[in-house]
Regions:
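Flexible, charged surface loops at secondary-structure boundaries
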Residues: 1-3, 55-60, 89-90
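PRPP-dependent phosphoribosyltransferase catalytic core
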Residues: 3-28, 32, 79-193
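Short, glycine/charge-rich flexible loops or terminal/linker lids adjacent to PRPP-binding catalytic cores
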Residues: 18-63, 72-79
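Generic enzyme active-site microenvironment
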Residues: 66-67
Length: 193
């Protein structure tokens, strides 16, 4: 008998105090419009915000939905899932819910054995939309643009880990091609637009 669904914002265990967009999504999951969906109508949606609270309530959790606004490579989600498992919650109880996901991130999460649900699935902006030879030219062009705007870290030339995302939200993910978000460095830290 399932009377409660637990939701948890995807977060990094090392930076848990950092405000993440998953917190905002969790807030909406508790609202009236969401409760009108038949799957949630007779369920209590319980928000858990910290890893220590997850551990404290692990025996009550039958379904845990990890939420975020965007999944890029899947690295953050997999790290969060691993931390959740360390707190005693098995992955067969875990699902990921996101607004937008890169296909590569979706595959990474599913490859680990955790279902992921997204409103929008995005392919790589260049590699998945052009023939190989044309894509290679466009990738080199994007790398030149990244150098011109002084993106110092080569692993960001095509977005984090070459995600080639074309996604912007309140805070543009670094998976997005850098000319959308890169503002250079200040005091040794990457500045985001």
């Amino acid at each position: 008998d399932l009377d409660a669904i637990h939701v948890f914002p995807i977060q990094d265990k090392d930076y848990f105090s950092k405000t993440k967009s998953g917190n905002i999504i969790c807030y909406f999951l508790q609202g009236t419009p969401f409760r009108k969906l038949s799957v949630f109508r007779d369920k209590r949606v319980r928000l858990i915000e910290t890893f220590s609270a997850l551990e404290k309530h692990k025996d009550e959790i039958k379904i845990l939905i990890l939420v975020d606004d965007f999944v890029g490579t899947g690295d953050t989600e997999l790290a969060c899932i691993n931390t959740v498992e360390e707190k005693g919650i098995t992955k067969n109880k875990i699902s990921v819910l996101t607004l937008v996901s890169q296909e590569c991130g979706k595959k990474a999460v599913e490859g680990y054995g955790v279902p992921i649900y997204a409103s929008v699935i995005k392919n790589k902006a260049i590699s998945d939309n052009y023939e190989r030879e044309e894509a290679e030219k466009k990738i080199e062009q994007m790398k030149r643009i990244s150098k011109q705007i002084r993106v110092k870290e080569q692993n960001l030339y095509l977005g984090y880990k070459e995600s080639e995302a074309l996604v912007t939200m309140n805070k543009t993910p670094n998976n997005t091609l850098p000319f959308y978000w890169y503002e250079g460095k200040k005091d040794g830290k990457i500045m985001l637009a």
